[in-house]
Structure formats: C-alpha cells, structure tokens
Amino acid sequence: AVSKDFVHWKFAGYCSFDGVGGQPDSEKTYWAPGVIVEGDSAHMFVTLKDDSTPVWGGPSNIVHFSAPLEDMISGWRRVNTVVDTPISIDATVVKNGDRWDMWYRDRPTEDTGGLYYAQSNDLYHWTLKGLAKGDINNVEVTKHTYQEGAYAFQWKGYFWIIADPHKGLAVYRSKDAENWEYQGIVMYEPGTRFFDNTRARHPSVIIRNER
C-alpha cells in the first residue's frame, strides 16, 4: 500500500518474488519483512517458508531480496539466505555508521530462544553475532520470556528497538546499538478506534517532524 501522508492509504498490489506471485495466495509464506533503502535499491529481509500449510507454514529462514526503488511490487529478486536456522523469523535492519545491524527472533536449540543480532558492511555478507546484548534477553530485568516482531530505528541520539512480548510492546534504547537498556512497556491497553480494540502487536515506526 502507498500513502502521501501516512493516514490515507491506497492498495498498490501484491508483491511477486523472482517473477512468481502477485496474487492474494501463494504457495510460499513471506512474512514480517524488514525493508531498508540504500542508494537506488530497496533491500528486504523477510521470513520465508517454503510452504503455506497451517498453522505457520513450516520451517523458516531469513532471506534477502532486493528490488529497484521504481518497482517495489514485482521487482524483488532473491539475493541469499542470511539466517538458515529453521525457526528464524522477524528481521529488522538499521544503518549504523558504515555498517548495518540486524535483529531477529531465533531459537537454534530448545534452550536458546531470544532476539539475536547480525552485522554487515554491505547488506550482502552478514556475520551472525549471537544473542542481543544488554537487557533485551535479560528475563530478570524485563520479565519477558518471549519476544518477536522487533523493529529498530534511530531517534533523538539513540538507537531504539520496540518488540512484541505478547503483553504490549517492550521498548529498549542504546547509544551503540549493542548494549540495550530496557525502557518498559507501552500500548498494553486496547485502543478505542475502530479495529484498534486490542493491545499493540508487531510494531513499525516512521519518524516525522521529530515525532
């Protein structure tokens, strides 16, 4: 969907990948895309499942697609697989100086679930760094045993991550995008507008006029 004011939106079509898709239903599952623009290209880091069977479409990887800015509906072409563990989901990417940082939900083993991070100097080659540092995976501080759908951005001199622990949205901030401090929960109570009758889930943020 596209908008000029972030209030009024117009449906623009269904995305296709490597020329396949463009319809409401797909044999594969693409969810929780993290999209970043660099130069004249858009880069999508999406949770990709090779089927769409209930309930969640089977094992998943985080896969990199790119598209020219003038065709962000049907221009997506696969670049590579960034995270190949079978339960990796929900990537978010932010530029940090001369590099890019990614965070995602993963559970490589039964006892190591949490938010993980990776770093890249070019968006194409990534180094997996392990569990995110600071308070993000510190249950004693946050009381959150599960978080997904994280979104990272920069605002007012800090890097921020807002994640979904299924009880409102958990907020973290950091000066260096590595050592995170927990800021608490927001949007726990349901809203009052039409279709806004539940607590917030899976966030995304756009900064306009310093807000």
Task: Please identify what each model-predicted range represents.
Residues 1-211:
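Carbohydrate-active catalytic/glycan-binding domains of CAZyme proteins
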